[in-house]
Amino acid sequence: MKTFFKDMAERAIKTFAQAMIGALGAGATGLIGVDWLQALSIAGFATVVSILTSLASGIPGDNTASLVNNKKEGE
């Protein structure tokens, strides 16, 4: 279960960063022109979606937040 939450946190942090970068570059030409509240709102929503996706993808007993089985055959 510990691995699941580590995976989920890693995905959520990456998603937040990616969404923030996308929101910042979408319409602003400089730091002053950025609508920071909107950018944080977009990144926050993307993070919530990431967490919900991880929870929905978690297979009991798999201990990861991935829907795909990453174990090699024979493990």
UniProtKB/Swiss-Prot annotation:
Q: What is its main location?
A: host cell
Give the GO biological process terms.
Answer: killing of cells of another organism
The listed locations are: Host cell inner membrane
- Annotated TM spans: 16-36, 39-59
Task: State the UniProt keywords alphabetically.
Answer: Cytolysis, Host cell inner membrane, Host cell lysis by virus, Host cell membrane, Host membrane, Membrane, Transmembrane, Transmembrane helix, Viral release from host cell
An example Pfam family from this entry, by short name, is Phage_r1t_holin
**What cellular-component terms does GO give this entry?**
host cell plasma membrane; membrane
Q: How does it sit in the membrane?
A: Multi-pass membrane protein
What job does this protein perform? Accumulates harmlessly in the cytoplasmic membrane until it reaches a critical concentration that triggers the formation of micron-scale pores (holes) causing host cell membrane disruption and endolysin escape into the periplasmic space. Determines the precise timing of host cell lysis. Participates with the endolysin protein in the sequential events which lead to the programmed host cell lysis releasing the mature viral particles from the host cell.
Q: How does it assemble?
A: Homomultimer.
- Quote the protein name from its UniProt record: Holin
Identify the taxonomic lineage of the organism of origin.
Viruses, Duplodnaviria, Heunggongvirae, Uroviricota, Caudoviricetes
